[in-house]
């Protein structure tokens, strides 16, 4: 489980620490 930002694949870590889709 080496996801960047600790999010699932296809998601990115936002400035407020949440994970949101990149699409």
From Swiss-Prot:
<comment type="similarity">
    <text>Belongs to the GBP/PSP1/paralytic peptide family.</text>
</comment>
<dbReference type="GO" id="GO:0005125">
    <property type="term" value="F:cytokine activity"/>
</dbReference>
<keyword id="KW-1015">Disulfide bond</keyword>
<keyword id="KW-0202">Cytokine</keyword>
<comment type="function">
    <text>Causes rapid, rigid paralysis when injected into Lepidopteran larvae. The physiological role may be to reduce hemolymph loss following injury and promote wound healing.</text>
</comment>
<protein>
    <recommendedName>
        <fullName>Paralytic peptide 1</fullName>
    </recommendedName>
</protein>
<feature type="disulfide bond">
    <location>
        <begin position="7"/>
        <end position="19"/>
    </location>
</feature>
<dbReference type="InterPro" id="IPR003463">
    <property type="entry name" value="GBP_PSP"/>
</dbReference>
<dbReference type="GO" id="GO:0005615">
    <property type="term" value="C:extracellular space"/>
</dbReference>
<dbReference type="Pfam" id="PF02425">
    <property type="entry name" value="GBP_PSP"/>
</dbReference>
